[in-house]
Amino acid sequence: MNETQHKALMLLGLARKARKLEIGEEPCGIACRSGKAKLLLIAHDAGDHTFRRARSYCRAGKPPYLCVPFTKEELGNGLGCNACALCALTDAPFAKAFLEGLPELAAQHEDILQELTRQTERVNKRHQEEKAHRKNVRFGKK
């Protein structure tokens, strides 16, 4: 594992602490079907049944999925558990940062990166509008 892959795993650990990451088949399935998942990550040594279930989750909720260059053990160790074959990022900025942290994947999946960039811009715009609204309410402007 090189340094960029290690940084990407550390970003996943940070997303877990921020509660922006679902780990395991059932929580990922719930996040995908409810539309909360922004990116589904599958370990490259996951079983065929796991791949089939992940694809069906993505068809139901429309998030993109990626086969990451980590084994189940590497992915699990980065997240603080024994093994993890499937995890879902539920925050667009984290998903975009993770994909940008792995340049070999980002080059292959430009369309996913563009969609995550668009979603991140929408999130940032909503935060700015909310901040302006709170300021206007505080100072009595309408």
Predicted regions and their residues:
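N-terminal first-folded block
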Residues: K7-L39
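Electropositive phosphate-/nucleotide-binding environments in soluble metabolic enzymes
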Residues: N2, E22, A92
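Compact, Lys/Arg-rich rRNA/RNP-binding cores from ribosome-related proteins
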Residues: E26-D91, A95
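Long, amphipathic alpha-helical "stalk/connector" segments that mediate intersubunit docking
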Residues: N2, H6-K7, L11, K141
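Intrinsically disordered, Lys/Arg-rich low-complexity segments
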Residues: R122-K142
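Helix-rich interaction surfaces within compact, conserved domain-sized segments
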Residues: G76-R126
